[in-house]
């Protein structure tokens, strides 16, 4: 039987995958930081298992530019699989409607 927490994580990963298909997602630490600096990012989602250096870079950049960064209990492999890629530590959402959907599930 699937726990409630696992259902919520699966729903979150599905929404991230949908954002990817809609072209509203940026993938990877460097690309996410560049998008934050460009003012496009509405929300950053990162794996809680990301390296300390990656977490620091994301947090510093997001905090400086006033972007919300959420760390979720998924592995980089799971996050990557949700978007059809290899392991990735973080993604950013560029669309306000997807942000509303995703934050209601965090």
Pin down the residues of each PLM region.
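N-terminal first-folded block
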Residues: 5-46
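Mid-chain, well-packed structural core segment of small domains
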Residues: 56-86
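C-terminal structural segments of small proteins and small subunits
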Residues: 76-106
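N-terminal positively charged helical leader segments and presequences
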Residues: 37, 41-60, 66-68
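Small/polar loops that bind or transfer phosphate-bearing groups
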Residues: 46-47, 71, 90, 94
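Short, ordered loop/turn segments at secondary-structure junctions
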Residues: 30, 49-50, 74-77, 96
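Long, charged, low-complexity intrinsically disordered regions
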Residues: 1-3
